[in-house]
């Protein structure tokens, strides 16, 4: 079973994504509100990090860059999400994929499947 670490601050999106991912057979871990994303990802070693670009207390692109600079941080596939079209910026900082919100479930699943 593939594991997904979810870094998203919108609780409605957390609930929706968790339900969709579990229905598709993924094991989901949701980031705690005060958790250090990079530290948590390196500790839990998920197959995929699904991370929002704009969170209340942090910038997903900065977290992505920090993850990629950390030892072992390049082993995790990262799919970034945002309501803003910042795909190029995400890819330049090491994301494996980007999905623009709002998105259909099948679009999400196709992106996740493409990550292996």
Per-segment meaning from a language model:
Residues 8, 82:
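Conserved acidic carboxylate
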Residues 11-29:
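Two-component/phosphorelay signaling modules centered on CheY-like receiver
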Residues 30-48:
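Acidic, metal-coordinating helix/loop segments flanking the phosphotransfer/catalytic sites
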Residues 33, 59-62:
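Acidic catalytic/metal-coordinating carboxylates
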Residues 39, 61-74:
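Short amphipathic alpha-helix used as the core "switch/output" element in two-component signaling
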Residues 52:
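Active-site residues of response regulator receiver
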Residues 56:
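The feature encodes the CheY-like receiver
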Residues 62, 84-100, 107-110:
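Alpha4 helix (beta4-alpha4-beta5 surface) of REC/receiver domains from two-component response regulators
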């Amino acid at each position: 079973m593939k594991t997904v670490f979810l870094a998203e601050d919108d609780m409605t999106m957390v609930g929706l994504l968790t339900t969709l991912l579990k229905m598709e057979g993924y094991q989901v871990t949701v980031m705690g509100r005060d958790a250090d994303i990079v530290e948590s990802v390196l500790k839990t070693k998920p197959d995929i990090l699904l991370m929002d670009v704009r969170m209340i207390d942090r910038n997903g692109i900065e977290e992505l860059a920090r993850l990629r600079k950390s030892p072992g941080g390049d082993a995790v596939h990262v799919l970034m999400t945002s309501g803003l079209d910042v795909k190029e910026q995400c890819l330049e900082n090491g994301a494996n994929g980007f999905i623009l919100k709002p998105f259909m479930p099948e679009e999400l699943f196709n992106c996740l499947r493409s990550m292996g």
